[in-house]
């Protein structure tokens, strides 16, 4: 997608378990298809209301997307989810079962979470884990350079929205370089 909030991809990662616990845990995520900016939360449930709470958080922070892409999980095909999208004039785009690669950006984020958060952090307490994950998401958006957006962070790309209305990398790179200090320099 070439414009911010033209489409977001949503997914649920999990379940995963903490040491010495049978409690299921999940990450519910929403990613802007253009800037790669992520809104994500740790949840002990994966119900439609939890997915909607996260989508509402995304909208409050980033504005309303034109379209939401998701798999066919029951959280995304429920009446309450679809009704929310209709009432808010957000298009609904579900991908066919068995084709997660169609949501490659959110799946790539999930892989990063598995490899750089779950595999690295020793988490024994849900509340502490939620704080750590919140810091991870913040660092992902604000500090982690992204190859798919020319080495800029998702927040740098998203913050350019006030000056630009497109994520066309050929046009945006020069303008971002002029206005933002590149991470790591």
What is each model feature region?
Residues 1-10, 15, 99, 153, ...:
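Basic, flexible linker segments flanking DNA-binding modules
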Residues 4-39, 44:
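An active-site-proximal beta-strand-loop segment
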Residues 11, 30, 36, 55, ...:
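Mobile genetic element proteins and their domesticated derivatives, centered on retroelements
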Residues 23, 40-62:
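Active-site beta-loop-alpha junctions of metal-dependent nucleic acid enzymes
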Residues 35-41, 93-95, 119-120:
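Short small-residue beta-strand/loop micro-motif enriched in glycine and branched aliphatics
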Residues 46, 62-78, 150-155:
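Acidic/histidine-rich, metal-coordinating catalytic segments
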Residues 70-72, 76-85, 92-115, 127-131, ...:
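RNase H-like two-metal-ion nuclease catalytic core shared by retroviral integrases
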């Amino acid at each position: 997608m070439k414009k911010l909030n033209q489409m977001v991809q949503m997914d649920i990662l999990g379940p995963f378990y903490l040491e010495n616990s049978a409690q299921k845990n999940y990450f519910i995520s929403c990613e802007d298809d253009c800037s790669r900016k992520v809104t994500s939360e740790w949840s002990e449930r994966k119900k439609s209301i939890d997915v909607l709470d996260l989508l509402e958080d995304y909208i409050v922070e980033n504005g309303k997307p034109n379209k939401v892409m998701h798999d066919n999980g029951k959280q995304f095909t429920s009446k309450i989810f679809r009704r929310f999208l209709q009432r808010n004039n957000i298009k609904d785009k579900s991908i066919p079962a068995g084709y997660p690669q169609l949501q490659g950006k959110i799946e790539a984020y999930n892989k990063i979470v598995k490899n750089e958060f779950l595999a690295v952090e020793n988490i024994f307490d849900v509340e502490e884990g939620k704080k750590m994950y919140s810091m991870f998401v913040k660092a992902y958006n604000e500090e982690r350079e992204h190859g798919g957006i020319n080495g800029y962070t998702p927040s740098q790309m998203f913050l350019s929205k006030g000056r630009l209305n497109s994520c066309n990398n050929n046009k945006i790179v020069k303008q971002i370089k002029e206005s933002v200090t590149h991470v790591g320099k």
